[in-house]
Amino acid sequence: MSLAEVRHDWQKAQIEALFALPMNDLLFKAHSIHRETFDPNEVQISRLLSIKTGACPEDCKYCPQSARYDTGLEKERLLEIDKVLTEAKSAKAAGASRFCMGAAWRNPRDKDMPYLTQMVKDVRALGMETCMTLGMLSSEQAGKLADAGLDYYNHNLDTSPEYYGDVITTRTYQSRLDTLTNVRASGMKVCSGGIVGMGEKATDRAGLLQQLANLEQHPDSVPINMLVKVAGTPFENIDDLDPLEFVRTIAVARILMPKSRVRLSAGRESMSDELQSMCFFAGANSIFYGCKLLTTPNPEENDDMSLFRRLGLHPEQGPQANIENDSALLAKASAKQDKSTKQFFDAAAL
């Protein structure tokens, strides 16, 4: 009988019981499921680029990009497509199979869409999977991104419904669920997870995973972030989470969503190699690669590759792993750009 049963009817008490298992029992269960559904030594690598930084109107208490907090972050306008392509090419050459683009918006404006869809098309021409995180999406906007070929859309739930109001007040939990519905209906793959270490209780971590696991279809990718405390944000002095509770969250996510990629996301820069190793054993099989995640630090690429070698892990090969034709692909992508790229850029500016 398969251990990797896909369910959408998890009760919170059942999830809390998993969290309460002795660590050895929890890790054994999670790793057994992980080994049944994935190559246990393969890790999918994504690169995340901030294509528009700062000045976000939302009040997420963890976020240095909120315009409501003085974090010293300088706002930047939307990046030109050629700069995005340069970063995407570099990411692919470094071993990333997916390129994620994030903008600090509540939601994209309709006049931004032609520019964003062109960006998607040009990055895909390099032979990479594409992902964007732009805030809330209407069904029409989701459809346009899907038509452009966007593979994944990220929109995190952040935490449990019960704790959500302590984290953010400018966007409802239901609006996040609605965006996920719009993304899934468009045919794109869903990337959705949350953040732990924000002062929530263990029952909130269970509640977050319950929401994700009980979606009509599990997210294809589930990023689990450890809070990165940033000076100037309301959460800068919040108590640290026990690292073993982070491992438990990874393990339970693997059990509840056996066929989803579980991404070891923000916060790795402060994690020991030993802690990351436990997370990989518990079922994490995706990371963000590169020295920065939007505006927060991330391990250096060489450090990640060194850890992979020591653990016997290897990167997942992307849809076009052979990079010999990168120059031709990049030239093709550049040639496909609309001659009015500057017009697109001006229209999408702050």
Swiss-Prot record:
One GO process term, biological-process aspect: biotin biosynthetic process
Keyword Transferase: yes
Note on cofactor: Binds 1 [4Fe-4S] cluster. The cluster is coordinated with 3 cysteines and an exchangeable S-adenosyl-L-methionine. Binds 1 [2Fe-2S] cluster. The cluster is coordinated with 3 cysteines and 1 arginine.
Root EC class: transferase
UniProt keyword terms in alphabetical order: 2Fe-2S, 4Fe-4S, Biotin biosynthesis, Iron, Iron-sulfur, Metal-binding, S-adenosyl-L-methionine, Transferase
Pathway: Cofactor biosynthesis; biotin biosynthesis; biotin from 7,8-diaminononanoate: step 2/2
Catalytic activity: (4R,5S)-dethiobiotin + (sulfur carrier)-SH + 2 reduced [2Fe-2S]-[ferredoxin] + 2 S-adenosyl-L-methionine = (sulfur carrier)-H + biotin + 2 5'-deoxyadenosine + 2 L-methionine + 2 oxidized [2Fe-2S]-[ferredoxin]
Residue span, Radical SAM core domain: 41-268
Cofactor entry: [4Fe-4S] cluster; [2Fe-2S] cluster
Pfam family of the protein (one): BATS
GO molecular function: 2 iron, 2 sulfur cluster binding; 4 iron, 4 sulfur cluster binding; biotin synthase activity; iron ion binding
UniProt keyword Hydrolase, yes or no: no
EC number: 2.8.1.6
S-S bridge residues: none
Domain of life: Bacteria
SMART domains for the chain: BATS, Elp3
Sequence positions that bind [2Fe-2S] cluster: C100, C131, C191, R263
Binding site residues for [4Fe-4S] cluster: C56, C60, C63
Family of the protein in this entry: Belongs to the radical SAM superfamily. Biotin synthase family.
Subunit structure: Homodimer.
Task performed by this protein: Catalyzes the conversion of dethiobiotin (DTB) to biotin by the insertion of a sulfur atom into dethiobiotin via a radical-based mechanism.
Protein name: Biotin synthase
